Amino acid sequence: MKPFQLDLLFVCFFLFSQELGLQKRGCCLVLGYMAKDKFRRMNEGQVYSFSQQPQDQVVVSGQPVTLLCAIPEYDGFVLWIKDGLALGVGRDLSSYPQYLVVGNHLSGEHHLKILRAELQDDAVYECQAIQAAIRSRPARLTVLVPPDDPVILGGPVISLRAGDPLNLTCHADNAKPAASIIWLRKGEVINGATYSKTLLRDGKRESIVSTLFISPGDVENGQSIVCRATNKAIPGGKETSVTIDIQHPPLVNLSVEPQPVLEDNVVTFHCSAKANPAVTQYRWAKRGQIIKEASGEVYRTTVDYTYFSEPVSCEVTNALGSTNLSRTVDVYFGPRMTTEPQSLLVDLGSDAIFSCAWTGNPSLTIVWMKRGSGVVLSNEKTLTLKSVRQEDAGKYVCRAVVPRVGAGEREVTLTVNGPPIISSTQTQHALHGEKGQIKCFIRSTPPPDRIAWSWKENVLESGTSGRYTVETISTEEGVISTLTISNIVRADFQTIYNCTAWNSFGSDTEIIRLKEQGSEMKSGAGLEAESVPMAVIIGVAVGAGVAFLVLMATIVAFCCARSQRNLKGVVSAKNDIRVEIVHKEPASGREGEEHSTIKQLMMDRGEFQQDSVLKQLEVLKEEEKEFQNLKDPTNGYYSVNTFKEHHSTPTISLSSCQPDLRPAGKQRVPTGMSFTNIYSTLSGQGRLYDYGQRFVLGMGSSSIELCEREFQRGSLSDSSSFLDTQCDSSVSSSGKQDGYVQFDKASKASASSSHHSQSSSQNSDPSRPLQRRMQTHV
């Protein structure tokens, strides 16, 4: 059988099916197509398939929709089936004007387009290729139907007597699926409604009814209540509303006088009301607390700053209800914090937002500043720092100022997360052969995840490796990583050390060099602060030496004191040290007067005999002559002259005591002797010396102390000095100042050493005109 004969047979089947019912006609059409396709495949062997098939879809009633069907290279008839019923053959759907077959027929496109979907279009659809004997998967088309406009029974205005309950009923009909109803008042949902649904005869649409009960206390005059119905077909919903018309409670007006007012002044609140029926009660409250002493229209009170933010309310009541009205008082007061600013921890590059709220009256000014900076960052409640950097971290101050009233401030901290920052001394010091440390100080928020030391080919993060140990500690300021090197060698001073720290935001590196401690002092560059340990060692050694010398001097002084008990006169030797005290002398007449005065004082006391004094003067004169004839073996090296215009050179010659412990060639200096006020007493303003030193051996009340007292009261005849034989004592240079165990308060800062001349020259102040050096001759 040829193809055109099959097509003719198919048309016959179609015409025959027209005489039958729609359901039978569809079956006949399918059988006809299948028969035709079978013969065609037998004759031609062609196989077809769908490139597009209809899919399940949802459409809102009244909207167009298209069901896809495409069979490439197929030029035969396509049949659309709806719930098992054929809509027509090919593109001829004249029986259903709302349906169209669209698409390129040559490309095998046979799409079914519904121009305006209706509830009856809600069905299962299928695309069939008759000659190819294939059919598509069934596709479900769901048609959504929005509800009718909702209706509130009794609307649009519902009259209600105050105190009566309110029942509202709203229904929304003919929706698919059933609508949902909500009740609204002032934009807020009212809960507590009840619902009921009814399925309509078509089995697809539904109606819904909602009932809302409102108690009398929740109803206000002129209030609008909304009923809104929604379903999938209309998500925005449809709504209607009613207005409640009831007798209103009292209308209240509340006034405050005077305003503005300073704190601790009296104000008057007046509450006037209009009501029907008449007002039955006035009630006053502040911050929700009832004011018991107020019960009428007027309330008087003394206000403070709380009245500015805490309103006073007046509640007026009649038979239909109550009305409450509140007022604040314009009280002048200084700034008070209402919202505390909070410290922030932010990431580098992000924004930091601080909020700080104050209350004050009159209007206050808010100033945001960074602590330590005079720059105003903001005058608003909110301070926003855009793209913060690490240098933005610190303290920020929110300050509020009420003109002519007061000011207040709060401080917050901004912490910025960022890469570590290493701030360490690039040159650090250590001693050769000792243990040395290199410190790396790291500031990092968040704390560093890793810290590593590297030098040469070595890398060490923690623990010990050979001579190297790494320790890390955390402090409030940051993290300190210490590289400890034991038994430092020369090569360590030539090595470059690298300290690197990482955190989640990045890293930082510092190059540190190790320098030998004390190298600056050797090169003449001066001492550095790192040489303190050597200075401590030297100080300890010197202290030990001084202690030893003090002990030796005490022993020598004790021996000298015992040997002096048997001495009758003063014996002068060439080897004795001569201490020359250079000063200016007044006129010879004054010298004689002083000489006579001192001699008379000595005679009055009776402690020294006249001939012993004369003997001492003669001995001193002889020694002076011998000294003048003696050649200085040092060529004046130890002669320290301060002035050359002196009129005379008085010399004190001190004889030695036994035993003589000084080494050969060393100087001896007198001990147990005080120079206090000697020359100030004798010479007045014209003298050169004003020694404040007082040196006393630690031997209690001895003959040396008595000698000292008499020496201060004695005289110097003919510009010469004398000492009693019992006062003669000396200490070897090996004792130095160790022999002096007790000092006068005026001499603690400049105690005498073993060479009195050296001590005097070192401790004297050149700016003092009355103090000069002593000349010491060996």
From Swiss-Prot:
Q: Which residues lie on this side of the membrane: Extracellular?
A: 22-535
Entry GO MF terms: cell adhesion molecule binding
Expression across tissues is:
Expressed in fetal and adult brain. Also expressed in kidney, specifically in podocytes of kidney glomeruli. Also expressed in skeletal muscle.
Record bears the keyword Secreted: yes
Q: Which InterPro entries match?
A: CD80_C2-set (IPR013162), Cell_adhesion_signaling (IPR051275), Ig-like_dom (IPR007110), Ig-like_dom_sf (IPR036179), Ig-like_fold (IPR013783), Ig_I-set (IPR013098), Ig_sub (IPR003599), Ig_sub2 (IPR003598)
Entry membrane topology: Single-pass type I membrane protein
- What does UniProt give as GO cellular component? axon; cell-cell junction; dendrite; dendritic shaft; extracellular region; membrane; plasma membrane; synaptic vesicle
Arranged from A to Z, the UniProt key words for this protein are: Cell membrane, Chromosomal rearrangement, Disease variant, Disulfide bond, Glycoprotein, Immunoglobulin domain, Membrane, Repeat, Secreted, Signal, Transmembrane, Transmembrane helix
Q: Where is the signal peptide?
A: 1-21
SUPFAM superfamilies, per database record = Immunoglobulin
Q: Which stretches does UniProt call biased (Low complexity)? A: 748-762
Subunit info here reads: Homodimer; mediates homophilic interactions to promote cell adhesion. Interacts with NPHS1; forms heterodimers with NPHS1. Interacts with NPHS2/podocin (via the C-terminus). Interacts with CASK. Interacts (via extracellular region) with MAP1B. Interacts (via extracellular region) with MYO16. Interacts (via intracellular region) with ATP1B1. Interacts (via intracellular region) with SHMT2. Interacts (via intracellular region) with UFC1.
Family per similarity comment: Belongs to the immunoglobulin superfamily.
Report the protein's function: Synaptic adhesion molecule required for the formation of target-specific synapses. Required for formation of target-specific synapses at hippocampal mossy fiber synapses. Required for formation of mossy fiber filopodia, the synaptic structures connecting dentate granule and GABA neurons. Probably acts as a homophilic adhesion molecule that promotes trans-cellular interactions and stabilize mossy fiber filipodia contact and subsequent synapse formation. Required for the coalescence of vomeronasal sensory neuron axons.
What name goes with this protein?
A: Kin of IRRE-like protein 3
Organism expressing this protein natively: Homo sapiens
The gene from which this protein is expressed is: KIRREL3
